[in-house]
Design a protein with these regions (language model features):
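Conserved short histidine dyad/triad with adjacent acidic residue
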Residues: 34-37, 48-65, 100-103
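A short hydrophobic beta-strand segment most commonly corresponding to one strand
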Residues: 97-101, 107, 111-126
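Short acidic-glycine-tyrosine-enriched beta hairpin
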Residues: 84-99
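Short beta-strand segments in beta-sandwich/barrel cores
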Residues: 38, 59-60, 77-81, 95, ...
């Protein structure tokens, strides 16, 4: 069963995740606990910000990330596939540090019947 983490007004939770390439060349994810990850809560140098609306039905086959970047979902949902065959659905408020810049990468597709709006924040010196 796919797990979907939601962020809604009035709730004090949001999903924070890291996507990375392990020694086997496959992409994986891990949940990030902000209280134990000070580098996530301190200022970081970035190179810009991009807002994107991804249409319903959009699917990208295996690809590594073009650079280390944060991707935050503002609305809609994305389903990300990983090298071990698992899939995870990310929704509004979920923030991902995408670091799987080598290896097979991951798949990305819009999940559900609404477009997905994301904000991408590339990290500097990556």
């Amino acid at each position: 069963m796919l797990k979907c983490v939601h962020f809604a007004l009035g709730e004090n939770t949001m999903g924070t995740f890291r996507m990375y390439t392990s020694d086997d060349g496959q992409s994986h994810f891990e949940d990030i606990d902000l209280s134990n990850t000070p580098d996530w809560t301190s200022a970081q140098a970035t190179t810009g910000i991009t807002f994107r609306e991804i249409p319903v039905g959009n699917f990208q086959s295996w690809h590594p990330a073009p650079r280390r970047q944060y991707v935050i979902i503002l609305s809609g949902q994305l389903e990300i596939g990983f090298g071990d065959g698992s899939k995870r659905v990310f929704g509004p408020g979920d923030a991902r540090l995408v670091e799987d810049v080598t290896g097979q990468g991951h798949t990305t597709g819009v999940y559900g019947d609404q477009p997905c709006v994301t904000v991408t924040i590339p990290l500097a010196n990556q």
